[in-house]
């Protein structure tokens, strides 16, 4: 869609590194996940284990235990994607109603403070506000996600960090830690 519609959202398909970065238990957990993926029929081209030396070719970490890598991941700049998708669907005649608080919804109908909208398809893209909608509240799982981004980093710094091919990364701990190199050379 982004290619067909010409949406500039900094799309980069560099894969993702799930890193065992701090504890040997992380390595055991990731290797167990890899066995589960193999049991599902996903092969070496889909997910592969990287020993510390191989991981260091992609991301330089202090004393890692290894990583699980999949090429099937891309990063984007989400605000640019949303603006591009909005332009695309509006050009098709779709009307977007922003700042419209949803009071209730059911299949085919959304009721807002300003009125009701009927549609064949309803996408409840409400993120953290799902609890206020009875049909969704019971399915909500609260997740906190924080993001910090550096200023654009010089090439010398990136040579020390890695991530030359646009890979995203994550650490295999209970507290979700993840990041990427942005198109304008920030570490986010």
Predicted features, each with a name:
Residues 10, 54-62:
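Flexible hinge/switch segments at interdomain interfaces of large molecular machines
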Residues 1-52:
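Dinucleotide-binding Rossmann-like beta1-alpha1 core, especially the glycine-rich loop
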Residues 28, 34-40, 62-121:
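Helical element adjacent to the flavin cofactor pocket in flavoenzyme catalytic cores
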Residues 3-12, 102-107, 116-156, 160-188:
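Active-site substrate-recognition segment that forms the wall
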Residues 47-51, 96-98, 111-112, 124, ...:
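General beta-strand structural signal in soluble alpha/beta enzymes
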Residues 3-7, 39-43, 60, 90-95, ...:
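Generic secondary-structure signature for well-ordered alpha-helical cores
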Residues 32-40, 47-55, 76, 85, ...:
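N-terminal FAD-binding dinucleotide-binding subdomain shared by FAD-dependent oxidases/monooxygenases
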Residues 26-30, 48, 74, 78, ...:
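Generic structural signal for well-ordered, non-membrane alpha-helical segments
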